[in-house]
Amino acid sequence: MSLVKKFATVGGATLGSRLFGFIRETFMAAALGTGPVADAFNTAFRLPNTFRRLFAEGAFNSAFVPLFAKEIEAHGMDGARRFSEEVFGVLFTVLLLLTIAMELSMPFIVGQLIAPGFADDPAKFTSTVTFATIMFPYLACMSLAAMMAGMLNSLHRYFAAAIAPVFLNFILIAVLAYAWYSGQDAVAVGYDLSWGVLAAGLVQLAIVWVAVRNAGIRIGFRRPRLTPNVKRLLVLALPAAITGGITQINLLINTNIASAKEGAVSSLVYADRIYQLPLGVVGIAVATVLLPELARALRGGNLNEAANLQNRSVEFTLFLTLPAAAALLVMSEPIVRLLFERGQFSPESTVVVGHILAIYGLGLPAFVLIKAFIPGFFAREDTRTPMIFAGISVAVNVSLALTLFPSLAASGIATAEIVAGWVNALLLFATLVWRGHWGRDIPLLTRIPRLVIAAAIMAAALYVAVDWLAFPLSSAAPLSTRALTLCGLIAAAMAIYFAVAFGIGGASLSMIRRSVKRGASASSVERASEGADRQ
């Protein structure tokens, strides 16, 4: 399977999950708006969800995948199964102890670390603690699922791990639909959603567990022991946890700061949901596929192939991310209005969330590039350098957020996030170049400015069109009119971008065909080699 096809497999499944996530957030916005229960649930959910993103999309896969792949190469499937059982025993024990400790200390964690601003509102504080207590075991489910997803990715089976998250949205949509049908109040909806999150974690764990068994690996429980392999995993995973979870660390810090203002937490969450669509579809797909592919190339001593993988991944991410960033910058309010403005979500909320979303658009390329750059370190088993840069990024984020929040509120926090993201991305790239791990690639260097020009032309056209179509995009127009107008604008913008990008040489069909053929050829060789090994 070619690199592009692998990106498409993971990205397509992620796209499905994110689209259902939009439906979920639309229902939630109508039911809870940006009121106190919305703040309580979003804050409570951020705690396990932060660890979910960190483990499922960052630290665990980054550390586990290269070691698991090495075990397959050195000792075959039996060695890989033994290694996975050793890790499973330690991970399960740690998660059990962590869950118990967190459940017992949840009032302190919420009141002192996550949302100290809620202490002045006893009802909101109590709801947040209760919701978080119900949902926190979701972390254990998703951490175990992340381990199994890493195994599947190493075996080039991407679909099950990528599609599992959609079931969180399925279950929460069903919960919200039932709440609407039965006429529940906001607090009852918050309780139902919390139990729904826990149920979704169990379902997702079951899906990847079945997929691993179908792949031929049956994981048994071993008494937890710090074997050499497990120690190596922990050494790699700790700094990778900080590095891969930099966005999540920033989100937790920002939640702490935002809790001082009513509605700020929920406004950031709603904007983040929209911005996560392109970030998830492109960034997570690239990071998930690139790490095992890059590790394989480096193990084989194929430095040219490794350099080509990195360059084509950056090219691919920018080709899709730059127009998405431009669209978020220009069309933020119409997008938020269409998706969320109904029920308890007011026009004033649309303006606030729209401003935050436009700011996130400026940072989108940085966060996607981070996901493309980090595998260049992790595949070489260097997790320390990205950890240092992550620490610098956190310091930038915290200092700016504290400085800007008093005057700009939630928009100040969003600004701090994107500045920190760009600092992190630039440090990662500069270090790869300085160490000679990023070869000069003429096609990439010539295409990037052309893609920027294409995105700028598209943004200018959208700016004029949004002003000209102000009424069809306003809340005074029927929902169907707004939806058709926005979809038409997006389609026209895509046509303009692709026409300009291909027209001025930012992209070419021959480039795409070469990528597919190169990946198909590599896959054929890989399959032949695997067949010879089995014989």
Curated annotation (Swiss-Prot):
Membrane-crossing segments per the record: 90-110, 131-151, 159-179, 192-212, 233-253, 274-294, 316-336, 350-370, 388-408, 413-433, 451-471, 484-504
KW RNA-binding (keyword) present: no
One Pfam family recorded for the sequence: MurJ
Keywords, sorted A to Z: Cell inner membrane, Cell membrane, Cell shape, Cell wall biogenesis/degradation, Membrane, Peptidoglycan synthesis, Transmembrane, Transmembrane helix, Transport
Location within or outside the cell: Cell inner membrane
InterPro entries: Lipid_II_flippase_MurJ/MviN, MurJ
GO terms of molecular function: lipid-linked peptidoglycan transporter activity
Pathway(s) served: Cell wall biogenesis; peptidoglycan biosynthesis
GO biological process, one term: regulation of cell shape
Entry-linked PANTHER family: LIPID II FLIPPASE MURJ
Annotated function: Involved in peptidoglycan biosynthesis. Transports lipid-linked peptidoglycan precursors from the inner to the outer leaflet of the cytoplasmic membrane.
Annotated family: Belongs to the MurJ/MviN family.
Name the UniProt record assigns to this protein: Probable lipid II flippase MurJ
Organism for this UniProt entry: Rhizobium meliloti (strain 1021)
